Amino acid sequence: MNIKLVTYFLILVSSLKVNADLNHIQDSFKYQEAEQLTIELPWNDCTAIHKFLEEKLFFSEQQIKKENKIHEKYKQFYLQHNNKLSDFSMQFLEKKSEINSVETLISGFLKFCEDNFQTSKSKSHSLNFFQKQQDQWLHNIRNENYKTYYKKKYEDNTFRNIN
């Protein structure tokens, strides 16, 4: 009787373990499928991006025209430096893998926009503006820390001089 119970218990445990392993395999397969999804970027047609920017960041038409000009300048810049016929040493796409080339292209475009997209009307939406704002904030904190440090040092010295 005890042998049958132990046998049934072992069969039950092994079947539960197999079921758990199958569930784990299915979950990992779904996760791998989700990782393989790719996002298509609308490089040629920027109207959807402009509409989104206009809705979310309240860009004016003038700013969108400036963005189009910057996009064209960048396109010319990119083609000039990525031309196979030219002997220019700088190449954006050094690695041949598709993912790295897209990432390099995006980071290059963001750097280009950061350097060039700075106008008085678009100050609040500019990357440079946020960087300067953050630098100013850190500078203010540093100044407060220095003030506190020197004030404490001065108070310590005056206290020592009194004694």
UniProtKB/Swiss-Prot annotation:
Q: Which InterPro entries match?
A: DUF2532 (IPR024386)
Q: Which domain of life is it from?
A: Bacteria
Q: Pfam families given for it?
A: DUF2532
Name recorded for this polypeptide: Uncharacterized protein RP458
Q: What is the lineage of its organism?
A: Bacteria, Pseudomonadati, Pseudomonadota, Alphaproteobacteria, Rickettsiales
